[in-house]
Structure formats: structure tokens, C-alpha cells
Design a protein with these regions (language model features):
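Periplasmic-binding protein-like
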Residues: 11-13, 88-92, 171-207, 230-241
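Bilobed "Venus flytrap"/periplasmic-binding protein-like clamshell domains
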Residues: 12-15, 26-35, 96-132, 137, ...
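Ligand-binding clefts/hinges and TM-proximal coupling segments of bilobed small-molecule sensing domains
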Residues: 43, 121-137, 175, 210-241
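Short helix-initiation/N-cap motifs at beta->coil->alpha
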Residues: 45-57, 137-151
């Protein structure tokens, strides 16, 4: 009998985790999902939505079976998260070296103007800080955000380190973009399954598979492949993000 199809939702603007080559979704996330759930006997349909919040809402409602996401108490209600993380992610402060930022603690950021993406969480402490001080400009896409940093319209960006570094490489003036070595927050990307999905009964199998992929080096290899492929494509296409 044909394999049962499961729906995986992605918003592919986070190389090397997920990105689009113009035809399909590429990167560590779709590769991992196809391998893992293929091995469990499923066919994977990739659903691309126009922003990250819509993926979260669709997973919560059971319209898609899974996403890759950070675990938060609010998300726990509707999503079952893998205990085994897919990847450690480090949110860094990016700045323009022509206007360096001096930051010892979170409070020091209040004196600078930041650029952030709608709908993103950057860790509870930082989110609270932003709510209190509010010295930020909100944008809907990273290209716009990093462009403002190059032109010194803003002083800093909070962004996942790997992704931000790849973005900066692509930009005219990007050689002036630097990241502070100290992470703002550290979080772990996990497989997040809708509690409405039959997959929610398979979390033990999912964890076992993730452990295997980590221990045999597969996750690191897929990540390295994605960085290489993205750089190669981005080098050939001006609009690649």
C-alpha cells in the first residue's frame, strides 16, 4: 500500500537550516525531515507558507503535522517537542564595525537602536527587555534588516549566528558587519509535532532517530553540505536568500 503522507511546514529564509533555491526548499531541516520520516515509512509533503507565524499556527491547529522550532511554554500546549535537539543555535548581536557597539550586559543595548523581525522570539529575557525599552525597528525580512545595518540606519541586529553570517557575506558592504562573540541567547532547534497528528504517538522513535543522526555525524554533514550549496547558489544569483 502507498506510504502515508505527512505535511511538514517551512518558511525557508534561514540558511543553512532552510532556504529556497527558487524551485524547492533546501537545507538541514528539509533534509533531516525527509530522511527521518522516510525511514519511519512516511512520504513527506513540504508546505511553504509566507511567514513563520503561519507555520506555527497551522501546526498548532493540526493542518500540518510538523515543523522545526524552539520549545516555549506557550507552544507546549499544541506541539510535542523532541527531547533530543536537532541543533544548538546561538543568537548573536550583529553590528557595523564603522559604528561599534559597547555592550557588557543586556541593559547596555537600551542606548542603541535595534532591528528585529516580526514574530520572532529571541529568548525570554531579551523579549522582555525589548517590551520595556522598545528602542527597535521591526521589519518583515532579513535582507531589509541587514541592509539597514550596512547603511548605519540601525546600530545592531539580533539574529541567529550562522544565518546572519551567511546573509552578511551576500551584501554589498557586508564586510563591515561583525558579530559580538558572546551569544545573546542559546536555544535548541527541535522537531515539533502537532498534538493533533498521529506522529505525536511516535516521539520515542523520533528521538531515537535524532540521536542516531547526531552520533553518526549526519546532522553535521547535512549542515556543512547546506552551507556549501547555499554559498555556491548565492554566488551565482544576486537575489538568493
Amino acid at each position: 500500500h502507498p506510504a502515508e503522507t505527512i505535511r511538514y511546514c517551512d518558511y525557508p529564509v534561514y540558511p543553512p537550516i532552510s532556504w529556497s533555491d527558487g524551485q524547492q526548499v533546501r537545507g538541514l531541516a528539509p533534509e533531516l525531515v525527509k530522511r527521518l520520516f522516510g525511514a519511519l515509512g512516511y512520504r513527506v509533503e513540504v508546505v511553504v507558507l509566507g511567514n513563520w507565524r503561519r507555520c506555527l499556527l497551522n501546526a498548532a491547529a493540526g493542518r500540518v503535522d510538523l515543523i522545526l522550532a524552539y520549545r516555549t511554554p506557550a507552544r507546549d500546549r499544541d506541539l510535542a517537542f523532541s527531547t533530543e535537539p536537532v541543533l544548538r543555535e546561538d543568537v548573536a548581536i550583529f553590528y557595523n564595525r564603522q559604528r561599534p557597539v559597547r555592550i557588557q550586559s543586556l541593559g547596555d543595548l537600551a542606548g542603541y537602536r535595534g532591528g528585529l523581525l516580526f514574530g520572532e522570539s529571541y529568548g525570554a529575557d531579551f523579549d522582555r527587555f525589548v517590551g520595556r525599552h522598545g528602542n527597535v525597528e521591526w521589519v518583515s525580512d532579513s535582507r531589509q534588516n541587514f541592509g539597514k545595518l550596512v547603511r548605519q540606519r540601525i546600530d545592531y541586529i539580533a539574529h541567529e549566528r550562522r544565518t546572519g553570517t551567511l546573509f552578511a557575506e551576500r551584501l554589498a558592504g557586508g564586510e563591515n558587519i561583525r558579530a559580538l562573540p558572546e551569544p545573546l541567547t542559546v536555544d535548541y532547534l527541535r522537531v515539533a509535532v502537532s498534538r493533533h497528528s498521529p506522529l505525536a504517538a511516535k516521539m520515542d522513535e523520533i528521538d531515537r532517530a535524532l540521536r542516531g543522526y547526531r552520533d553518526d555525524g549526519s546532522i553535521q554533514r547535512w549542515l556543512d553540505d547546506s552551507v556549501r550549496d547555499y554559498r555556491c547558489l548565492a554566488g551565482n544569483r544576486a537575489d538568493a536568500w
